[in-house]
C-alpha cells in the first residue's frame, strides 16, 4: 500500500513529463485497477509486456524523483508546516505545497 501511495504522489508531480502511452499504462494499472492480463488484452500485447511497461514507468518516476527531489522537498515542507504555530504562515505554506 505504501508503494501505491508513493507512486501516486510521484505521478501527481511528474506525470506531465511522461509520454501519453506511459501515462495510459500507469493510469490503467494504478487508477483503473486493471490487472496485467486485462491490460494485455486491451493493448493486444503479452501480459509480460504490460508488466514490463508499468515497471518502466515506475523506474522513470523514480529517476525523475532522484534528479528533481520534488517529493522529498514536499515531505520536508509538510513536516515544517506541522510545527508552525502561526496559522496564517502555516496556511500560506500549505497553499504553496
Indicate residue ranges for each PLM-predicted region.
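Short amphipathic alpha helix immediately N-terminal
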Residues: 20-32
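Key DNA-contact positions within bacterial/archaeal DNA-binding proteins
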Residues: 47-48
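Hydrophobic positions on the alpha-helical face of helix-turn-helix-like DNA-binding modules
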Residues: 38-40
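Intrinsically disordered, low-complexity basic tails/linkers immediately adjacent to helix-turn-helix/homeobox/MYB/SANT
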Residues: 69-90
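Short, Lys/Arg-enriched N-terminal segment that forms or immediately precedes the first helix
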Residues: 3-15
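C-terminal flanking helix
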Residues: 58-65
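Residues within the DNA-recognition helix of helix-turn-helix
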Residues: 53-56
Amino acid at each position: 500500500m505504501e508503494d501505491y501511495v508513493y507512486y501516486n504522489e510521484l505521478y501527481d508531480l511528474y506525470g506531465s513529463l511522461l509520454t501519453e502511452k506511459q501515462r495510459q499504462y500507469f493510469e490503467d494499472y494504478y487508477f483503473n485497477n486493471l490487472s496485467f492480463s486485462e491490460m494485455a488484452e486491451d493493448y493486444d500485447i503479452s501480459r509480460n509486456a504490460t508488466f514490463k511497461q508499468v515497471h518502466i514507468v515506475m523506474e522513470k518516476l523514480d529517476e525523475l524523483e532522484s534528479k528533481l527531489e520534488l517529493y522529498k522537498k514536499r515531505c520536508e515542507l509538510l513536516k515544517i508546516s506541522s510545527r508552525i504555530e502561526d496559522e496564517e504562515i502555516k496556511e500560506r505554506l500549505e497553499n504553496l505545497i
